[in-house]
Amino acid sequence: MSILNVEHLSHGFGDRAIFEDVSFRLLKGEHIGLVGANGEGKSTFMNIITGRLMPDEGKIEWAKKVRVGYLDQHTALEKGMTIGSVLSSAFDFLYDMENEMNDIYARLGDVDEDEMNKLMEEAGTIQDMLTMHDFYMIDAKVEEVARALGLLDLGLDKDVTDLSGGQRTKVLMGKLLLEKPDILLLDEPTNYLDVEDIEWLKRYLNDYENAFILISHDIPFLNSVVNLIYHMDNKKLDRYVGDYDKFMEVYEMKKAQLEAAYNKQQQEIKELKDFVARNKARVATRNMAMSRQKKLDKMDVIELAAEKPKPEFNFKTARTPGRYIFQTNGLVIGYDDPLSSALDLEMERGQKIVLTGANGIGKTTLLKSILGLIKPLSGSVTLGDYLEIGYFEQEMDQSITTTCIEEIWNEFPAFSQYEVRSALAKCGLTTKHIESQVRVLSGGEQAKVRLCKLINRETNILLLDEPTNHLDVDAKDELKRALKEYKGSILMVCHEPDFYDGLATDVWDCSKWTTRL
């Protein structure tokens, strides 16, 4: 049974086409991985099929009474919202029904007997609906899901703006679970999730009987949960049966076959053109030349897609620092309450350290405390000599209205326009991206702009807070290569063992010193 039909969909921004004449069917129970490079339009596609964005052309048709749950990259959680209020908002439609029922009861004293009977019948129908949906057990349901996701210990009255990125993702995921939609749309759900949360999500999706569409650049995760791949590339959407590894096998084979056919056809075209050029003027061979020209005119010429710009990340290294990068003495990190026991840590020159552990235990807070962005609750941090620090934050400020060019120029005012454009292009951004406002780019493209700032500044210590979030496969592979070759030291928060394996000299498990477990 078809849950969703998309026919002849085309969309773009300005003169930049994102996709053209895309058609797509979602069937009951399909577990789909939607893949493609950063900026190919995956999140845009999700926004269109959920009605958040109107397409330039095409038709989107959902089956009747289908409830859609959508977890996107940039869902707004505003100050004043609590964990409990966000989870309870999954039942807003039931609260609306309760309000409608209460309004009916309020009107009963002002109507005649016939009207009263009608209203009572209407109120009874609503009451039955509320009972059927377990309306009077909402608090218990919210508590059950919060406990399963490890949110109950944080407190249901905790403001969502005080949560870590992973904790916010879990709150939004919990809301989806409570909504019990007929289809899940998940846009990079593993960003900010720790290893245990990702394992939990794997189990949940494997047991999920309904359909889902999943955007992810986490290949092991994709391989474990999907049975179909839709590849968004060069404004088209192609379907492949199997997991990501099977898709890559078939995709590379098709690509090689197309290139072989292209080369063979180009050789044939060259020979035909040579024959026509040599023989069209001679009376004896003119007819043969005309025949060859007709063959050329009728030929369906194979076109190869232009190669996507691949990023090149090469970090510049500053002078050698002193022996110690930093030392802490009785350091207790946190905001109002402590997140750690007293820490006596030290990092030496040349170490490449990865911080691991569950969400919300203080990994980002530790980075910010070392940098002096947050004052410790007690204890001290001593930075080493001759440090040139590069810092990569989890997210970019979405209120920024500058273009990519302006963003880099503000950071490096001595650069010429050519140097700015060249620096951005080396990070895998096209001319259209470079001239766009940063905030309209995809999460992966924004990350590349921030990496552009980092690699063009001389550093000898990098503090990286989940740098792989949003990056596509090519960008991740290139970043890993660049960090392995980097001559300086690295302190990095990362939840992807595949990324830091072979890169890290040390792994610090922050759960050993946190007060939150």
Annotate the PLM regions.
Residues M1-A260, P309, A318-L517:
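ABC ATP-binding cassette signature C-motif
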Residues V250-D300, A305:
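Intracellular alpha-helical coupling/juxtamembrane segments of multi-pass membrane proteins
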Residues F313-F315:
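Post-kinase regulatory C-tail/linker adjacent to protein kinase catalytic domains
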